[in-house]
Amino acid sequence: PDCEERELSRLNNFFCFPYLNKIDVLNTPSWVKNTVWYQIFPDRFCNGRPEISPEGVEPWGSAPTSFNFMGGDLWGVIDKLDYLEDLGINGIYFCPIFTSASNHKYDTIDHFSVDPHLGGNIAFHTLIEEAHKRGIKIMLDAVFNHLGADSPIWLDVVRNGANSHYADWFWIHKFPVYPDTPKSEWDFKNFNYETFGNVIEMPKLNTENEECREYLLSIVRYWTQNFDIDGWRLDVANEVDHHFWRDFRKVIKDIKPECYILGEIWHEGTPWLRGDQ
């Protein structure tokens, strides 16, 4: 017995704790820890150029609704950068700014253009330059789980059905994608494709499709390389496959190692926090 106890004592908890390899540990860029973020819903923040506001824009200060527009734009944000700096913030997280039909812009039409009613790519480029001069970081909201129903990619599927080049970019149960009934009768029980949150205007992307994946990754390359953004906030990240997020991280970190990646996870986040997503 004494000999057996001595042998056991030599183990010193061997195998009781896992060995953590550096590559498996999630590293948050050091600058993030000292960043005070300010979230901006662009349409509601400041109208810098009324001439680019959407048609039917509400008078500033009107009661907000789910669908109305107030006319806020990126020029307005530029006008208020000194004010934001005085508040003590040093990071701006923007709700989606890419071209779309809604005020919230989670229904993307074109991922490669800032919505013209927000000032387009020129306004965004100017904003980045002016923010960086003040030491303010910029994080964009990336919606890679779904597209908007007005996206040319989705409209091609609507028109051409199974013959569309993009038919496999979405999770479609059968064609045609829309039911043969008046639109007033459509609901999540009778349309023929997967969506985000049962919202018919947001068809869900199939990120297992190689072309679809590469399209989305090309968006990341474009904005990170050409506009030097500092972070990506990933909308409903838990609804996009892990393989895609691993590729996403590699693309981002190859371009800008200090770029911040933040995922929206509505439940236990551990599977996304292993250093590879």
Name each model-derived stretch.
Residues 252, 260-265:
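Aromatic- and carboxylate-enriched substrate-binding clefts and catalytic-loop regions
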Residues 41-90, 97-221, 226, 248-254, ...:
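Substrate-binding/active-site clefts of carbohydrate-active enzymes
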Residues 36-38, 92-94, 138-140, 232, ...:
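Hydrophobic faces of well-ordered beta-strands that scaffold small-molecule active sites
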Residues 1-35, 48-59, 64, 68-69:
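The feature marks proteins involved in alpha-glucan
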Residues 223, 230-233:
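Conserved, well-ordered alpha-helix/loop/beta-strand core segments that scaffold catalytic motifs
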Residues 237:
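Glycine- and other small-residue-rich loops at beta-strand/loop junctions that grip anionic moieties
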Residues 268-277:
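Noncatalytic carbohydrate-binding groove/subsite architecture in carbohydrate-active enzymes
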Residues 33-46, 277:
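Carboxylate/His-rich catalytic cores and anion/metal-binding grooves
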